[in-house]
Amino acid sequence: MEFDTIAAISTALGEGAIGIVRLSGDEAVQLADRVYRGKKPLQEVPSHTIVYGHIVDPKTDEIIDEVMVSVLRAPRTFTREDVIEINCHGGLVSVNRVLQLVLNHGARLAEPGEFTKRAFLNGRIDLSQAEGVIDLIRAKTDRAMNVALKQVEGRLSTKISSLRQALLETVAHVEVNIDYPEYDAETMTLDMLKDRAQFVRKEIDKLLMTAQQGKILREGLSTVIIGRPNVGKSSLLNSLVHENKAIVTDIPGTTRDVIEEYVNVRGVPLRLVDTAGIRETEDIVERIGVERSREVLKEAELILLVLNFGEELSKEDEALFEAISGMEAIVIVNKTDVEQKIDLTRVRELAAGRPVITTSIVQDQGIDELEAAIASLFFESGIESGDVTYVSNSRHIALLEQAKRAVEDALEAIEMDVPIDMVQIDITRAWELLGEIIGDSVHESLIDQLFSQFCLGK
């Protein structure tokens, strides 16, 4: 497949030691040679070699920058095209001047994700691996990065391909049965079809069992801190983040809006939201914050309900318990450094079996227990780091669920003695749906949409 030559800055913009301008395409080496000056032309440099030289404007002979240039020839590159990486001095000016010179001499500015898109279109990676690259870039914890890295390496692709192969072999047997009915192989084929379908359904179930944990690792666990004003919600946020992100005072209603922060809790990424204290108020600004808090609460996957150890349970506290009925929650009784007035027995009754943790945030007590409770609530046996293949992408999860339904339709048809060619339709449908995960059968508009999520230069 032939493409034009593209270029982009592949390092983060801003001050730094090194900035890299990446080129990819059939003319990448020749184009770079137009602006490079070194001991010998880049076209004479062996593949996978880095050389020293200068980037020079050929029109004026002005030296733009002192550089190291990596020469990487197809097909042993990420895009399976010729690739040039110009290592410039970091900073906005030097890297942009080199990029502009390259663009002026024939390269096209790459679209977001276009390097990875070419790797996909040229068969270097499949679609699930490409999506793993996005997850790797966006990973918020080491565990999330490890899950993404396994996807980039093809762990999920291998699993999906093996399931598709099992279905394909089954379809092939069915077609032989249909084309050569004189061999009377229908009973054998139906038995085989049932066994294969049950095997594929079981393997899909195994993948879907990792979906909740995988999605949390990929997207973060939507966690909302709620409670009456001045019970220590903002102090809790600051303690978990290990920074002063929220204003902490003794004045009720200090937090008037929703504050959101990513937090790494024992390998679990939390999208932690500190809400305005939920109470009736005449303050217009605070009232808006309270309404936003109620909206955020509806979408939360985990609630951290904070109570005051030094105050009796109020009607507002009991109303909050009612508001989170049936939701995953941890109850935090804060301010154990003051005299106890709260009825902990009643708190545990209202918690209805959910964890109750006592803390004194000002004395840094109870935070370890809280973090352990959060991690165990969603990763009861810990976060697997071995051979587990996590499914973390919403698109993959939806396709696996659809493929499972198609397989179940086939099994139901077999039990009802439906003609074998009708059963084949469901099996083929499952095969196609699994193919969409790795990009074997997917619409071009979806491909464009997926790669548009990438940053420039990747």
Swiss-Prot record:
Residues at which K(+) binds: N230, T249, I251, T254
Binding site for GTP: 230-235, 249-255, 274-277
This protein's UniProt keywords: Cytoplasm, GTP-binding, Hydrolase, Magnesium, Metal-binding, Nucleotide-binding, Potassium, tRNA processing
Sequence positions that bind Mg(2+): S234, T255
Biological process per Gene Ontology, one example term: tRNA methylation
Pfam families tied to this protein: MMR_HSR1, MnmE_helical, TrmE_N
Annotated GO MF terms: GTP binding; GTPase activity; metal ion binding
Cellular location(s): Cytoplasm
TrmE-type G domain sequence ranges: 220-379
EC number: 3.6.-.-
Region forming the signal peptide: none
Superkingdom per UniProt: Bacteria
Keyword Cytoplasm: yes
GO cellular component: cytosol
Cofactor note: Binds 1 potassium ion per subunit.
Co-factor requirement: K(+)
Purpose: Exhibits a very high intrinsic GTPase hydrolysis rate. Involved in the addition of a carboxymethylaminomethyl (cmnm) group at the wobble position (U34) of certain tRNAs, forming tRNA-cmnm(5)s(2)U34.
Subunit structure: Homodimer. Heterotetramer of two MnmE and two MnmG subunits.
Family from the record: Belongs to the TRAFAC class TrmE-Era-EngA-EngB-Septin-like GTPase superfamily. TrmE GTPase family.
NCBIfam families reported in the protein's UniProt record: mnmE_trmE_thdF (TIGR00450), PRK05291.1-3 (NF003661), small_GTP (TIGR00231)
Protein name (Swiss-Prot/TrEMBL): tRNA modification GTPase MnmE
Higher taxonomy: Bacteria, Bacillati, Bacillota, Bacilli, Bacillales
